[in-house]
Amino acid sequence: MMNSKKQDAFQRLIGALKVLPNVGPKSAQRMAYHLLQQKRKEAEELVDALQTALRQVRHCARCNTFCEGGLCDICADETRDGRRLMVVHMPADVSNIEAANCHDGLYFVLMGQINTALGMDVSAIALDRLAQRLDGGEIEEIIIATAFTAEGNATAYVLSEFFKNLPYKVSRLSQGIPLGGELEYVDAGTLAQAVYERRLIKEGGA
């Protein structure tokens, strides 16, 4: 049986692992046992990688995704079409859309979505940084690329209202994406079709 100090350290590890998505107490406990019993070297590498990421990874000054410099590779790429800005929930969405090869414009990453059940309101979606991103640019069309979930739809509605009186054409991905589907789990073909067949919300001009 663990003494109290070791028990405290073990419980602290479990508590830390529980912050990961979809990891409950039992899953966290299994992971903790696995790391301590069978994967100590890998656990040390994990700690080192996490500490390095915490020191070096920042938000892109332009699109708000994660990067290690001032600008991410996409924002720094002068060949991208700066007239079209796609607004997504998280960095994984950018990766998936890039893999589908269906958007050659730029992105803005909200780093959150509205979830009233969890107390996540408009402050969760970085509208202030989005407003800064729009200043002085060449943007003509904004593509809302949130998921067709309750949270994604709520976020899309708030974004539509935010853009309503601004001089941009606004569209949203078509509902070829399954209802309740997160972009993270949508195959490349379906995602590309949703981009190409996106639904117009408003024409350009205030």
Swiss-Prot record:
This is Recombination protein RecR. The keyword Amino-acid biosynthesis does not apply. One of its GO terms (molecular function) is DNA binding. Residues 83-178 form the Toprim domain. May play a role in DNA repair. It seems to be involved in an RecBC-independent recombinational process of DNA repair. It may act with RecF and RecO. Keywords: DNA damage, DNA recombination, DNA repair, Metal-binding, Zinc, Zinc-finger. GO terms for biological process: DNA recombination; DNA repair. Belongs to the RecR family. NCBIfam families: recR. Gene3D superfamilies: 3.40.1360.10, RecR Domain 1 (1.10.8.420). A zinc finger (C4-type) spans 60-75. InterPro entries: DNA_Rcmb_RecR, Rcmb_RecR, Rcmb_RecR_Znf, TOPRIM_dom, TOPRIM_RecR. Pfam families: RecR_C, RecR_HhH, RecR_ZnF, Toprim_4. The keyword Cell membrane does not apply.
